[in-house]
């Protein structure tokens, strides 16, 4: 490579590649020269590479030549958002396409009798496949291309399919042969060969999805490739002739139940179609399907960008987009239906801990450890299962990556319509589920919907979620008055509140404070519902209505009405003291406690970073801990990236990218060992137990302050500045990994033609820098010990890594409410028993417990105490003001209170009521007295809960923003671990 050209690459590597700043036309001559040199090199090398050492040098030299001469140019082109190139450039890229296919076809490493030492390296194969993939993208056929371009492109696409399919056949056949071989002396050789075949197969699978997508659109219709693929997805389809967005595609597909109209493969089956079925069959793999789906919509959106047709992306025009109706239904309705069915089966298989251990209850702090032998499906395992296995989760992560690519190219006009179409089909299916099915609702609203928000909140310009449809479902669950359904609804409202539009928020506030006020605070007997509703009111509703002229005073008036009603009934409240003076006061310390010993504790959230997870998975292959233990753990994480061990999931990339990603993750993890050690299920400094005393609870929460500031190493993988050197501070393992990466650019002294472009290795150490610029994303590689002609060798990084990389750094959750267990006080149990006796409730005591008569002296004692209390009331009057809870109105700020008349409930004066019959009057009086006591008790509890929640809010607002908080716990069946709901 000449100095001028080399400097040109260096400049492109460090500057932002604008849409017009990079021209492939400038590299036409360079690409032709590189092509000729590569052909000469591989022809000469085939004669000399006769041993392992020479073959290794050949593979490394070939890999580096392709990286620096071809792959760098292709990556720059794909990153420049250009969609057209000259005929000459198309010709040279087509020649490269044929050459790479011939090079891969000439490889005999997949033959069972080929020595492993003489096989092409996996790394060289990955470089070739990425070059092929990039060429396919650059040469994509769009509306302005000629029919000649279409024919050439289609022909080479067919050659690629044959090449990849033949390799898949060889891998499958030889793998079976090797597994059947039981000879001990060949065992180690066979194992190595099998490992090689598995790695090769993994590379091909990463490319198959994209290859299927391009073949779906660009192979001639006579091959019926699109029909074969759609039949693999769903066999119950029919076809008809109709005009399409793609002028050369005439067939429209739709679902049918008519056996006579269904497509039969026998009608068009031939030698080619049988061959296509092999590569199409891989669509059944989730990752291959998502890769196909990514490129399927990429081709459509690119085509629409330059099309003169009026076809848009909406339900009424799906017939003009080939296969869209079939594929959309499959990945939305069928995916979610399959996910929920599998999830329900798993939940139903959960053993009942009460049967396994009668002496341990679910609220026991050590419940998990005491019942570990029962293999309970914990909340952590459920969340990990959902985010690891749900196809719906994979779908929306795929759409998020595609959105990042399309927005980079500055044509989002059809993108929102495409996303809205997927969301509307999802809503259509959700609307068919009963509002009483809280298990499905919890998965959909608190996992799937929340995951969609997490994925797209880093792209605020995209507004495609139809909030009105979602909150209509939430309100339907509130109307059921089922505790589990209401819990799911309130949880979702709290967590999604900041993302809902202002208009929809106001509508929700009106409905909650008008239609559901009495239902949620008085008619509901579950403390959890009261606590969650108060959290929604204090943390979300009150701050959001401060600027609303019509709703500003509504929450204030509601709380004020409660307090005034309490004041009116103050005398009756005093009369209640003679029965149990602690009934009301006890709620001040336990206002936020539910299920006896459970509480939602506010603690800082420590991000469970992708880099840390990638390092753990690659460092420990037998890792058994959950990768996604909670919903908040995926707030800044891409599950598919983790499941692919840090690799890009939707296309084939050079293996060096994976090595660099792992080394970067390791470096970040090792530089923050203390912080990473503190990460436990995504939380930092959480407490498992706390005292019943309120002061200890407050002090415990203050100890869990969130550590401010983030390390500079939390920058994305697209800003790599990772320097690997062998210093005295590095461990031996780090040296070996750095040397391994350094050897990727090892210099072959026997090939003089490549000496000018391959950096040499220093005898003392290796200093390599792989660098992605903040804007250009360019990956730089140079040897600092020996600089060739004082120029650096540049390798541009793959632009795919930036498509969804913002998710890693977009940490929208700073604090969470986590379920914790508090120490159970024996007095609480006694109070529960007293309350049960007082109201005549039959509780689940020992089956041998016999009710005993009350002693006569105890009856006399109670009567005497009542008389003394009545006399004391006469003397002291209303001197018990300290017993009445007063709402904390400070949260409303300087709210101008409306002096409106509040409907007041006065004491019922029984003497003024003219009711005949002494016994009837007495019974009626007792009933009214009990009603009033119950009402007053509920108001006191509500005010205490409100005040306790306000204290939490002030503690939170003093440190962080109002919308950076998240409630993170699981709604489970009452017989399962970590349950937050009980059935009465």
UniProtKB/Swiss-Prot annotation:
Residues 687-698 have a biased composition (Acidic residues). It comes from the Eukaryota. Residues 675-712 are annotated as: Disordered. Transmembrane segments: none annotated. Pfam families: DUF1765. GO terms for biological process: osmosensory signaling pathway via Sho1 osmosensor. Disruption phenotype: Cells are viable and do not display any phenotype. One of its GO terms (molecular function) is MAP-kinase scaffold activity. Belongs to the UPF0592 family. This is UPF0592 protein YDL073W. It comes from Saccharomyces cerevisiae (strain ATCC 204508 / S288c) (Baker's yeast).
